[in-house]
Amino acid sequence: MRRDIALFSGQWADLPLGDVLDKAKGWGYDGLELASWGLHLDLERAVSEAGYRDEVRNAFAERGMTINAISNHLVGQAVSDRYIDERHARVLPPAIWGDGEADGVRQRAAECMKTAARVAALLEAPVVSGFTGSPIWHMIAGWPPITPEDVDGGYELFAEQWSPIIDVFDEEGVKFALEVHPSEIAFDYWTTKRTLDVMDWREGFGINFDPGHLFWQQIDLVGYIQEFGSRIYHCHGKEAALSLNGRNGIISGLLEFGDLKRGWDFASIGHGDVSWDRLIRALNAVGYSGAISVEWDDAHIGREDAVREAVQLLRSYSVERTGGAFQEVFK
């Protein structure tokens, strides 16, 4: 069976859903990773209004397209972040932000993540992708000094916050895929392992594998896939490109994307330093059969050009695993 190539609709949420579906189908995509913001999916309406759900389903069915995943990245960030501030206010729905009081924001965000699981089940989407936030990301520099107890406490708090959410995912038969990403509880190899450990490797909690966030950290992408393949539930299609010229630093965190003083930047597929041929082989080898969801995060290429090229390149790599079939002619 041919692997689905999906378009992540988050960077297209300014356009009506039907328009994005028409564009995506015309470019050769099989479906969408459907963003739960902008003009694409209202979770509260979807969980309570059968007619609204039918509208969403029909929009896909009429075009022969699939809901490969539902994204709730923006809200998920607020569940575990230690500090809730104006950054969250810019991206959270008003109903989640409310009066901005931190505990209330976290509680409403947690309930919204549960709603996302219920909506995914109703719309027959197998995965909800998203962020989690982190109680300890603000300690990343290690100064002022931190202790092992500080870090342990952060992971324990994370498990307390997310276990009840994943209970609902389990009840609904839907997987949650954390996009491993700086600012989240898992951002590299070792923090991925620790996060899965603290969540007891429960099946409802897994990974959205995005090489663009790992490559610039010098993580072995194929090794990462081999280690965590059983918990890779979703995959983003993008790259990163390094520009370490003796002046540009690897952190680059306070520079806008696209600034030439950055030591790395996101790149569209085919325009960075990631070998998607090798990644597809590795994903096939660990049995990943889900979609690759193309995400436009490139400050140097327009979104239509980027995603049109990406699906063509991925299609040339995204063949099903052959196993040992090529040897059958010799038997």
Give residue spans per PLM region.
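Conserved, mostly hydrophobic/aromatic
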Residues: 24, 32, 60, 70, ...
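Acidic/histidine-rich catalytic cores of soluble enzymes
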Residues: 4, 31, 70, 146-273, ...
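Active-site beta-loop-alpha junctions enriched in small/polar residues
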Residues: 8-12, 35-39, 72-75, 133-135, ...
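Boundary/entry segment of secreted carbohydrate-active catalytic domains
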Residues: 1-15
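Catalytic domains of carbohydrate-active enzymes, especially glycoside hydrolases
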Residues: 20-38, 124
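Aromatic-rich peripheral "rim/lid" segments of glycoside hydrolase catalytic domains that contact
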Residues: 299-331
